[in-house]
Design a protein with these regions (language model features):
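ATP-binding Walker
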Residues: 305
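Extended, charged/glycine-rich binding lobes that contact polyanionic ligands
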Residues: 1-294, 298, 302, 312, ...
């Protein structure tokens, strides 16, 4: 079949047979070509972007999670996750179903507003089909209220459990990502491209390196064969030592939670052990081209990394 006629804005470069089928996560990375329009001065901005990309090739790109991790219209996914970690299930449900955002269309906005006012059936009736997950949760609450005359914590838990497993898992994962971004931001102030004693280091296969060779660590860091990590917080994730470890501990303390909180005792299936994630990623095959109204930026980055992290470094130069 002609895939390009079926898949719009997709270009098929090559098709090959393989003895093993492809699985999620097996890609090496992604190549991007992004147009930044309405820049101040395309000629100067091209030079600025090239300088930024050359610098990032040396230091690595801060491994921030992109805004899409938290919800593009309503950035609430991580807030729901925080409520689950804190054990406030009612607040988690209220945050997901209610809490309207001014960027939403009128119908979803009004439906969420009705929920916040306690008008559950009216809210349900007004919700469009696109809000199927909110409707699924709300249906549980309405049935419970009709049956028992009130909504208990168990009912709110059932409302959460009515969601598909990937979505349920996303809440706490998004909160972990939010906290990780805080770690990256703080660690960037003291350097993400150098080894600090006490760092927990991973190699290119994302495996922990338990023995650090002081004679070669700087060269390994420069080659990106080794990278420092930060915590995706969880009940079993270890902290680094030294100043960077103090940063990691302070960030979670400021949230008024502990590692144990990530066991999510009221919704244990949604708990997380946590892992360590690289604080930076390698960027390759970069180029910048001037256009009539801006610049085109091209680059290749590993899987699991966000192009928005690269754009963040370019755009903060006020191009």
């Amino acid at each position: 079949p002609d895939f390009e006629e079926v898949l719009h804005n997709v270009k098929v470069l090559d098709i090959k047979q393989n003895q093993k089928k492809l699985r999620m996560g097996q890609l090496k990375g992604n190549k991007f070509k992004i147009h930044i329009k309405n820049t101040n001065n395309p000629v100067e901005d091209k030079d600025i972007a090239e300088d930024v990309l050359e610098s990032l090739k040396v230091t690595g790109v801060p491994n921030f999670y992109g805004f899409q991790r938290f919800g593009e219209v309503r950035s609430t996914t991580h807030l729901v996750g925080k409520c689950l970690v804190e054990g406030d299930i009612k607040k988690a449900v209220d945050t997901y179903i209610g809490n309207p955002n001014k960027n939403e269309h009128n119908q979803p906005f009004e439906a969420r507003q009705l929920y916040d006012e306690g008008k559950l059936q009216e809210s349900y009736d007004l919700m469009p089909k696109s809000m199927r997950y909110e409707k699924s949760m709300l249906k549980e609450l309405i049935l419970s209220k009709e049956k028992h005359g009130e909504i208990t914590e168990k009912d709110y838990i059932r409302a959460i459990e009515s969601l598909p497993k990937p979505l349920k898992r996303m809440f706490v994962n998004a909160y972990e990502s939010y906290l990780f971004n805080k770690v990256v931001n703080e660690r960037s102030k003291i350097g993400i491209n150098k080894y600090l004693p006490g760092d927990i280091i991973i190699n290119e296969e994302e495996r922990w390196v338990h023995e650090i060779d002081e004679d070669t660590i700087e060269d390994d860091m420069n080659k990106f064969t080794l990278n420092p990590t930060g915590p995706l917080y969880g009940s079993k994730v270890p902290y680094a030592e030294g100043k960077q470890g103090e940063i990691e501990k302070r960030i979670i303390e400021e949230e008024n939670i502990t590692k144990e909180s990530f066991k999510c005792p009221k919704t244990p299936k949604l708990g997380s052990h946590g892992i360590r994630r690289s604080l930076r990623f390698k960027i390759e095959d970069t180029s910048v081209t001037k256009t009539c109204d801006g610049i085109d930026v091209e680059f290749f980055i590993p899987r699991g990394c966000y192009a928005t992290a690269v754009l963040r470094e370019i755009m903060k130069k006020n191009i």
